[in-house]
Amino acid sequence: MADSHDAPFRLRSYQAEMVEESMQSNIICVMDTGSGKTHIAIDRTRAELEICRPDKIVWFLAPTVTLCEQQFAVFKSNLPGYGIQLLSGKDNLDHWTDQGVWDDVLLNIRIVLSTHQVLLDALSHGFVKMRNLSLLIFDEAHHCSLKHPAHRIMSDFYKPRIGTELPRILGLSASPIKTAKVTSEDLQQIERNLCATVKTPKLHRSELLRYVHRPHLMRIDYPVEPQDLQSNMLSFLKSAYTNYDLQKDPWVSELLQQRQQGHDVTKNIHKVFIGGKTYCRDQLRSLALKAEAMSQELGMSVMDWYLRGCITQFSKMVHMSDSQLLDWSADEKRHLLEILRTLPSIDLNSHDIPPMSLGSMSHKLQLLIKFLVAEAKHDPEFTCLVFVEQRVWVACIAEVLAIHPETRDLLRVGTFVGESENSKRKANIASISEPRNQQATLENFRAGKLNLILATSVLEEGIDVSSCHLVVCFESPKNLKSFVQRRGRARKEESKYVIFVPQAGRRRDPESWQSLEEGMKAAYLDDLRQVKLATEKEQQSETGHRNFEVKSTGALLTLDNASQHLHHFCSILGAGPYIDNRPQFEFTEIRPGVITARVILPLTVDPEVRTACALDTWATEKMAKQDAAFEAYKALYVAGLVNDNLLPARQEADDELSELQIPDHRPSLVPVSPTLDPWPLFARHQQQNPHVYYRTRLTLHTVDDKPKHLILLTPKILPDIPELLLYWNSSTKLKIESSWLHDVVLNDEEISELKSVTYKILYSVFHNRMELNRRDFVWLVAPCDESGLLDSRIWLSEWRQHTCLATELIAQNSDWSLWGLVNQKGDARKYTPRSTSMNNQLWLLQLMQLPKRRDFLHPVLESANINDAYTKTDEMAAKDCIVDPVPAPYSVFALLLPSILHRFGMAIIAETLRTTLLGPVALDSAHSLLLTRALKSSAADGNDNYQRLEFLGDCILKFIATVHLMAANPKWPESHLTAKKGRIVSNGFLARATIAAGLDRFMITKSFTGAKWAPRYAGDLLAETGPAVKEERSSKLIADIIESLIGACYTVGGFEKAVLCVQTLLPLEPWISVPAANSILHEAAPAEADLMGLDVLETLIGYTFKKKPLLLEALTHASFSGPHVHCSYERLEFLGDAVLDYIISKRLHAHSPELSHQKMHAIRTATVNASFLAFRLFETTIDEETINKTSMRPESQKRAIWQFLRSGSPSLNANRDNALRQHEQVRDEIIIGLNEAARFPWHLFALTDPPKFLSDMVESVIGAVYIDSLGDILTCEAIVRRLGILDCLDHILCNGVDCLHPKERLGHLAVDKGVQYARVGMNTEPNEGDKMYKCQVKVGGEDVGDVAEGLKRLNAETVAAWKAVGVLESRKDSAIEIVSDVEEFFDADDGGGISLDDP
C-alpha cells in the first residue's frame, strides 16, 4: 500500500472514484504501488463505520505481521476515534479457546487488523461470525488463490452464506496476478475468489499517470563466479558433512541406548540411517549450502567472514547457555562444536569475530559498490533501497558497506529483514549471523538519518517506505508480483529501477518482465493504447468558440480565459497548510477519440455548484478542460459567487457612503455634526406658545435637612428621568427627584414675576456669568411646596433687594433658615447659614462653605484633595458677615441646576432619538435612560457610558450579521461570508452608516464640567441660524454608537428589538430576522437517514442530532474528499464562532455585580481564544471500556471529539499529534492554574501552539447544534458547558480571576516607559527541529526578567511579559493602574486588545 508519509494530499479524484465504487459493490482496486491505496482503505473504512451499526467490525487483512503492524499505526493515526485492535501470533491466539475471551478482546473494537490465518482460525472455531463484519479489506489481494488462507476465508465462510447478511469486500493490489502467464481466466478466477470485480480508475488514467512516476528501468550484467574456486574452510565444512559419522551422532547414540533398554525405536533408527537426517548433520548441511551460495554471490572473503561469525557466535552461545539453544541437548551442542573446531583458521578460544577481508569479493558485489558510490556522489539527496534474497546476505553486505573505504563515509546503511521465521523451531547455526529486525530503520530512513536500506522481500508488499530515487534488485525478482511491487518503491521523478542479471543466467531480462506486465494489465485495463493515442491527440490543434457576456458591464467569459478565472476563484477561497484548493478535472473517453470532462471544486464550495461538466465533447483533454471550466464559472456567476465583472463576489461599498472616504481598517478622525442642542427647539416652542408651560417639580433630598422643592417650567414637556444622584463632596451625596405636574397657561404678569424670580435665584450664584437684567430665559424656576404650588415667599416684596449685614437680620429676629448665602466682608467665599448663637455678648454664625465646584454629576475622588469644608461647620462673627437676599436653599438649588439641566438635556437628546430615528424600533419612553447611556462616550462620562452596551452590541451585531448572511447566502463559502461580515461590522462601514442616518448628532462626547456654565437665553437660541461647525471624532467612536444602541435595544427586547434596530440604522442590507434565518438554515441542512455510526460522537457532544449530516459536516476538514460529505466545516465554524461569542458575552454583560468593559473583554478573550478552546477539546472525553489482549483486564480508552475529524492530510495528523503531546506536557499545570490561580494562566497556554483546526472544531460543532436545534441557545449553552467552557467562565466570575493578558498588564505597569520585545538570536532546538523564538523584555531600555522562548513570536512574548510582570510587581514602587478614561476601547476584532494568533 502507499506510504502515508508522503506530502500532504487531497484525495485525488481517481482515489475518490475507487472509494465511491467500493461503496456501491465489492471491488478489487488495482493501482500502481505508490498511487494511494492506503488512503482509499482509510476513507472506505471511515465511511463504513459512519453508516453501519455500532456492533459491526471492519476487518483489515494483510499477508505479513510486519505489514499489519505498520497499517495498525496508520489506522490509529487516521481513525483515532474508533477502537482498533491488532491480532497476531504474538498474542498467543492459540490459547484463546473460549468465546468469552474473543468477546472481551473485541469489546468496543470497530477495526481489527490481522493476517489472513488469524481470521480464518477465528471463523473456523466460530469465535467470529461473518454477520458481525461490515467490511473485509484484503490488502495485497492477489494472495487470494489456491489454498491461501485468504481464499479459504472466502470459499469456506463467505460464499456459502451469500444471500445472508455479509460484509462488503474491498481488495487492494498493485499486481493482481503473481505469475507471468496471464490469461483472462486468471483474472476471472481472482474475481470469483473474492466475489468482487477488478476495478482500475479508467476515468482518470491521465491523472493517475501524472502522480505515479514510473522509474527508468536498467540492468547491470555481472559475470558468474567460477565454480571451481573453493576456500579451505568451505572444503573442510563440506567434507565434514559428506563424511559425517552417524554412529557418533548424539541423537543416534540416544536411540541405540533406548533400544538396549527395551524401547521400540527400531522404526526411528531405520529412518535416520536411510535418510541420514539428524539435527547436527542438518546444521552442517545448512551451513555448507549457505556458505557455498554466498561464495558465488558475495565472494570468498565475505563467505569466510560469515562462517567465522556463525561458528564464533555459536561457540559463545554454547558457553553462555543462550536461550535460543534450550531445545538442543548438551551432547548435540558439544558434538557439533567439536566438529567445527576442526575447520582451519577457527579459534574458539576467542569470542570476537575476526574482521572481514575485502580481498576476494565477487564481481557482482564489486559492481554493486561501484554503482552505489557513483549514484550517491551524483545525487546529494540519494536514497536507495536494495533488495537482497537472503537474510544472511543482508548482514554480510551491510558489513562490507560499513568497512569499505569508498562507502563507509558515503552511505548510511540500515537493514530490514522483517520478522524471523517460526520462533518455536530450534536455532539454526547458519542463521545466527542474520541481522535482527530494526523497526527504527524505517523511521530513520524517513527522517533522513539513513540513505540506504538493505532489505529482503518483506519490503515488497505494502510496508510504508518513503519514496526512493533508486531501487536495486541484487537478484532478479522471482515472479511478476515481486517485479511490480519492488518497482513501485521507486516513486520519485527521474528514479531508477535496477536489476542485476547474470551474464549466463536463465532468468528473464528485466525488459521482458516489463513487457509481460504490460500484457497482463491489458487483460483487465485496455487503455494503455488509448492513453498513448490521447497523448498524440493532445498535441493536435483544436479550437472552440463559446462566450458568455454580462450585459451590464460587458465582462466576457470565453473558453480560453475560463480556466484562469476558475483557478483564481478557487485560490481565494481560503488557503491552509493542509488544503489544495486547485480545481480537479476528470476526463472520460465516451468513445474512441471523443472526450468529455468534469471539474470538481474544493469542498468549501456549495455542492450545487461544486461540480460541472463540459457541455460538448472534444478530441483533446485540453479543450474538454476549458469547456468544463467555462460551465463551472458560469454556474458560479448564476449562483452569485461571481459578480458582474466576472470576479469573485465582493460587496462594493455604497456609492453615497463611500464618498466619505472613511477607512475600514483602523480608527481615524472624521468630521461629524456637533451634538444636538435640545434648547433651541424649546426656544421655538416658547416663541410659538409663549403662555403654555410644562411643569416639573424638583425635590432636593439632603442628609440633615428636610426636602426642598423647586418647580421647573419649560415650553416643552421634559422627559422623565429617574432619581438623580449628585455628589456634594467625596462623602456626601444629594438626591434629586423629578415628577411631572400638569401644564399651565400663564399670563404676562405671572411670566414676568417668574422670570424675575428665576433671575434672582440664578444671580445669587452665577452673577459673574449672567447678562445684567436680561430675563428671556428658555426655562423658568421658582420655589414651590411639596404639592407643587408656588411658595408665597416668591413674591418680590418678600425678598430683599440688596444684601445686608447679618447683625441687622439678627436684630430683626429674622429666621436664619430663610437667609441667603453668607460671606465675610472682603472674602468672596460663600457659606450657607446653619444656625446662630451668642458667646460673650458676641453673635456668632455657624456656617457651611459653599463648594466652588459646578460639576456635581461626577464623584469627587479622595485623591482630589477636596476637604470636608463643604460639610464641616465653621463659626464666624455675625458683625463681619454679609447676607444675600435670596434664601440659601434656592441658591443651593441654583448651584445644582447646571448638573440637573445637563441630565435633562441628555434625556431630551435620547428621547428625540427614540421618537425619530429609532421610531421603528418602538421603544418606550421609560427606556430613555438606557438610550442616554448608549449615547455617552467615556469622555462624556467615565462611569456611566456606552462601553458596556457597546461590548454587548458588538457581539449582537456580529451574531445577527452572521445568521443573516448564512441564511441569505446559502451557497457562499466561508471566505465570502467572513469578508462580507467583516465589512458590515467594520468601523468604516458603521461610521458611514452613522453619518448617513444623522446619528452622529445624538452622540454625547463632551464631559460636563459646569465651569463656564451660564443660563441660555431664548433670543440667542433663536438667532442661531448658521450651519453647524463640524467636529472631528474617531471613526471607532462613531461606529461604537451604533453597536451600543444595538446593545440597548437587545437589553430592552432581545433579538426582536435588536434586529429592528439593525434594520433601522443599517438599511442598506436586507436583513433577515433571527427566527427566520434559523428556519432557513435548518431547512437547507441535508437530512440522511443511513448514518448509524455516530452514537459515540453524540454522547461526547451531549446532543442527539435530528439531521446527522450536520454533525459529519462539523467534523469535515477541507482536505477531506471521502464519501458522506456535504461541505467542509468552515461555514459551521463561522456560525459557531458567533454563537459562542454571544453565549459568553451575554453572560458577562448580565453578571451581577456589573463588570467593566475592560474586564469583560479580558474574560471573553481568555475563554474563546484558540489555545483555550483546543485545551477544552482535548479535555472533553468519555471513557470506553476495552479489554487488554495480553492481561485480559479491562482498560479505559478515552474518546474525544478531535479523534473524529475527517481529513485527508497526513501532515494535519502529525500536527494534531504534536499538539496533543504539548497538551499532555502542560496539562496538569494548566488545570491547576485554571482552578487555583488568581490570574488566568496565559503563560502556560503560551507553551502550546495548537493548530487552528482544533479550535475550529469546537466552533463548528456549536454551529451544527445551533442549526439542528433551530437556533435554541439553551441547547447550545448546554453544549458549551459540556465542553467545560462555561464551568471555567463561572469559576472566573465567582472567584474574580484576573484575565488581563500579561502583555497588557506589562504595559500598565510600565506606565509611561516604553516596552520592547527584543528578539534574541535565531536558534533551532534539537527537539523535533522546532525553531524556537526567543525574546527579552525591555522596559525603558532596561532588561526585565529572563529570556523567554516559544514556538512562535507571540508565545515567546507572552511568557517574557509574564516573567517581566513578576519582576516589576515585586518591586516596592510598582503599582498597576488600569487607565479607563479613554474615549474608546478597541476589541481584538477591531485592531485593539490582544490577539492570540501569531501574525
Swiss-Prot record:
Pfam families named in the record: DEAD, Dicer_dimer, DSRM_2, Helicase_C, Ribonuclease_3
Q: Does the keyword Amino-acid biosynthesis apply?
A: no
User: PROSITE patterns from the entry?
Assistant: DICER_DSRBF, HELICASE_ATP_BIND_1, HELICASE_CTER, RNASE_3_1, RNASE_3_2
Amino acids binding ATP? M31, D32, T33, G34, S35, G36, K37, T38
Which part of the chain is the RNase III domain? 897-1054, 1094-1270
Tell me the ranges covered by the Dicer dsRNA-binding fold domain, including all copies: 562-656
Question: Which residues are listed under the site Important for activity?
Answer: K1252
Q: What does this protein do?
A: Dicer-like endonuclease involved in cleaving double-stranded RNA in the RNA interference (RNAi) pathway. Produces 21 to 25 bp dsRNAs (siRNAs) which target the selective destruction of homologous RNAs leading to sequence-specific suppression of gene expression, called post-transcriptional gene silencing (PTGS). Part of a broad host defense response against viral infection and transposons.
- Could you identify this protein by its name? Dicer-like protein 2
Which organism does this sequence originate in? Phaeosphaeria nodorum (strain SN15 / ATCC MYA-4574 / FGSC 10173) (Glume blotch fungus)
- State the encoding gene: DCL2
